[in-house]
Structures are given as C-alpha cells and as structure tokens.
C-alpha cells in the first residue's frame, strides 16, 4: 500500500504482503455453480490480505478491496488513510450460497485476523485498519453466532471485533485490486514483515 510505512518496507525489500461450521447445506468445492449470488463485507485491516484470503475459497466468485463504514461518498485511498472519513478498509465478497454459506465465510474470517487488537491489524495500525463484520439484517444471526463461537475460543473479554450493520461499500482504486496475486513478491515481503502468520498462530494456535 502507499502508506509511508509500507512504502518504506517495499523499498527496503527491493520492491519485492472459527469455530466449526454450524450450517448444513449442499456446499463444497465439488458443488456446481448454482448461478445464485450473495454478498458479504468484511474489514480485517489491510484489504490486500483480506481479499487474498477469500478469493481462494471454493464458492467465492469475487473479492473486491474497498472501504465501508464512513460518511464520505466514493472516498479515495489517500482520503481514508489521512482520516476524517470514518471509513475503514474492507472487502466485498461475492459468493455462491449453494457452494459456501455465509456462516462459513464468517467462521473463516475470524481465523485470518487478530480480533483482540482494537487499533488495527499486525503492522497496520490506525483507525482505517479497524476490524468488523458488516452484516445485513438477514446475515446478522449467523454473524453473531459465529462471533460468539470464535470469542469462546480465545476469551470473550479479549474479543473486540464487532458485528456492524451493513452499509454501502465503495471499491478502492484499480491498483489495489488483486494486489497479492499480481504482486506476489511485494505482497509476500509485506506479509512477512508484518508477522501475520506468527501472530495468527499465537491467537488461534496451530
């Protein structure tokens, strides 16, 4: 990302980044595409990482990096990073509910973040890197149930990531989309520097 810290990291690296499913449904990698589409929105710090985590899941049709939760329409990345917009980095996940359920997506999301950090994620700290699940009224029961199950694993008092009401999602600039896939060396260097894997093991175990 173009934030000063990450820019420095990239240059320094020679420009090199829970609970068991509770729903029973005909889901899985072997299921055929039903043509149905639903949308989920997750904020887990750096949207490069969140997007990459979801786009490899069977049943996920698309993952788009962007912003949610704020007051400014069609914000730019620089506006969000500077602050004052109320937005946080988020990813909109489009999925086939016949292949993967919303609950399964939320369960997976917890395992890719540190939900005990109120100030950001890993080396990305600040208001724009806060975590959240943005859920519609229909999605909220599954999201809340998943949150309770995940919190029980690590201690409810430590678990700070909220389930928030669904709001409008704004896509980020084109150069942020598919960043991990298109820039594997740069993203890999960023991810290692941030210590994502080690921290996730510390929070969730092996």
What are these model-predicted stretches?
Residues 1-8:
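Bacterial N-terminal signal peptides that target proteins for export
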Residues 2, 13-206:
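Flexible coil/turn and secondary-structure edge motifs
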């Amino acid at each position: 990302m173009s934030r000063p810290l990450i820019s420095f990291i990239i240059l320094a690296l020679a420009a090199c980044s829970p609970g068991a499913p509770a729903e029973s449904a005909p889901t899985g990698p072997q299921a055929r595409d039903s043509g149905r589409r639903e949308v989920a929105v997750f904020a887990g710090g750096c949207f490069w990482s969140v997007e990459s985590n979801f786009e490899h899941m069977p049943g996920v049709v698309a993952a788009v990096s962007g912003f949610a939760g704020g007051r400014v329409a069609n914000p730019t990345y620089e506006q969000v990073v500077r602050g004052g917009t109320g937005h946080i980095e988020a990813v909109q996940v489009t999925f086939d509910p016949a292949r993967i359920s919303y609950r399964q997506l939320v369960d997976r999301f917890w395992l890719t973040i540190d939900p005990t950090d109120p100030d950001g994620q890993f080396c990305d700290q600040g208001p724009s890197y806060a975590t959240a699940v943005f859920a519609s009224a229909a999605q909220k029961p599954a999201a809340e149930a998943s949150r309770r199950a995940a919190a029980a694993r690590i201690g409810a008092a430590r678990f700070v990531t909220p389930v928030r009401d669904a709001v409008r999602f704004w896509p980020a600039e084109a150069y942020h989309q598919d960043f991990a896939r298109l820039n594997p060396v740069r993203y890999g260097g960023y991810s290692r520097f941030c210590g994502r894997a080690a921290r996730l093991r510390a929070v969730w175990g092996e």
